[in-house]
């Protein structure tokens, strides 16, 4: 199997919202984002798929080492890195942003709680903000401020993921909601770990939803006018996640403890087409 074929298979297996905007891209850009997303999926699998933390750490260290070969003109071992080697020069993808993504996965191995929102934002920057920046580079931009937009929009998407996955993460022993905010709303950790929503938990989650929604608006305002056309695929992803956030809100955000909300594939396609034609309006 060719390296690029491996990446396409990896992405197809994920059934991700990423796929909904791909059809609007050139083949070259579609392939590049496919490779990037396959890289992200592989790292996620290291953290979520290894039950032994020591094995996960060894595997993550191996990914760091193999990534070095991508940027040192050596032949990497993993097919994702082989595909990445082929595209990183074409789109000027910097090594430090891939390293930051691995650093974010390292945080998942080392800590299960975040004291403050500032701590959580660092995590979000590493696992989502830099992905947004890499996607922005692949899509193309003329104004450097577009990278600020991409980082902020990555934060919005990751906050949405965190809200959606509160129950699932709790069952894996993780709570991403900041401790300071849980204390402010008088929500002890056992409420989340035992997946038993309370009125205070509902208020905490409404606060999370409102902040995420405002983050989408702030991110959209950061996108320079001259790059709105080139960044449309990123906006499609944002629109789908924003719709997910609204569904969680309508359903009752406290219910994330008991089940996971998802946007059906046909609706994702409708959102993608609408956003392509009329833009994203959070």
Q: What are the residue ranges of the model-derived segments?
A:
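Catalytic cores of Mg2+-dependent Asp-rich isoprenoid enzymes
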Residues: 1-159, 163, 167-282
